[in-house]
Amino acid sequence: MNTVPFTSAPIEVTIGIDQYSFNVKENQPFHGIKDIPIGHVHVIHFQHADNSSMRYGYWFDCRMGNFYIQYDPKDGLYKMMEERDGAKFENIVHNFKERQMMVSYPKIDEDDTWYNLTEFVQMDKIRKIVRKDENQFSYVDSSMTTVQENELLKSSLQKAGSKMEAKNEDDPAHSLNYTVINFKSREAIRPGHEMEDFLDKSYYLNTVMLQGIFKNSSNYFGELQFAFLNAMFFGNYGSSLQWHAMIELICSSATVPKHMLDKLDEILYYQIKTLPEQYSDILLNERVWNICLYSSFQKNSLHNTEKIMENKYPELLGKDNEDDALIYGISDEERDDEDDEHNPTIVGGLYYQRP
């Protein structure tokens, strides 16, 4: 077990540790969270009482340092810091515990939900997606865009003749560097296999993604889980797009190892089970889920996911699913600029359009 002390709580805030949260009043004598399980990554997240739209937080692994939270009045944020003096850190923690000013990490539930939500998420992979190498923890907030979103916006601005720069373009530390998934790219569609690769993404999934970029299914699932959690905790739109794209890529492939399908079904079950119902309109794309569960190659492989979706979100399912198609974020101008119909187009993952 480990501890994250807080130096103070000068403003009212909702504090979350993993999937649990609680409110702290202004200047309440609160000094941290103790008994955090070691062995998983964790996330501490914040939402200020006077700023309902902004959510932010820090991913960390207790084994990688002595972390504490300090409020920065200049930026108006609770910031994670690292104390490199181990003895000093232990003395501070002991003092706060003695004064009973810390809350305990909630008792692990029967299903060990946090393990199931983060089974494949590793801190070293997080730090590659959230590129801020000087820290042993990673900051994420609701406003962060993905590198791929920035490229799409940059391309659109250039085509419109604008000199404006895409937000976060020059600040990779404030972007999420998820793996680019582009179904129209040269990597996805091989010369001589255009129709095959257009209809069935097995080559793109198995050869390009699993064998090439990710090296194995564990790394693939790690990014999928991380994207979901960033979408859920921070309402991060780009993360929601990445989560849907990675699910869609598997479901659009006829050839997928059975162990991978079984694990995907388990992962999605716990994700949908944990997702707060009030977020469904924002984070669940009706079109994508209908395709995956009822029209895709893998429509008979996700039994647990289908069951919990039908029980929890019946209003999202079963609407003309056989004829639904993905709506890609590709403009007419981008089509006109292609040398041929299979040249890659810069897209922000799979962009799904709500009806």
Swiss-Prot record:
Region spans: Leucine-zipper: 261-282
Any Pfam family the entry gives: AAR2_1st
Entry-annotated residues carrying Phosphotyrosine: Y328
GO cellular component, one term: U5 snRNP
Residues annotated with Phosphothreonine modification: T274, T345
Subcellular localization: Cytoplasm; Nucleus
Primary localization: cytoplasm
Region (Disordered): 331-355
Biased composition (Acidic residues): 331-341
Protein's UniProt keywords contain Phosphoprotein: yes
Subunit-structure text: Heterodimer. Interacts with PRP8 (via RNase H homology domain and MPN domain), competing with BRR2 for the same binding site. Component of a U5 snRNP complex that contains at least the U5 snRNA, PRP8, SNU114, AAR2, SMB1, SMD1, SMD2, SMD3, SME1, SMX2 and SMX3, but is not a component of the U4/U6-U5 tri-snRNP complex.
Similarity remark: Belongs to the AAR2 family.
Additional notes on this entry: Present with 7330 molecules/cell in log phase SD medium.
Stated role: Component of the U5 snRNP complex that is required for spliceosome assembly and for pre-mRNA splicing. Involved in splicing pre-mRNA of the A1 cistron and other genes that are important for cell growth.
Protein name: A1 cistron-splicing factor AAR2
Species name: Saccharomyces cerevisiae (strain ATCC 204508 / S288c)
Originating gene: AAR2
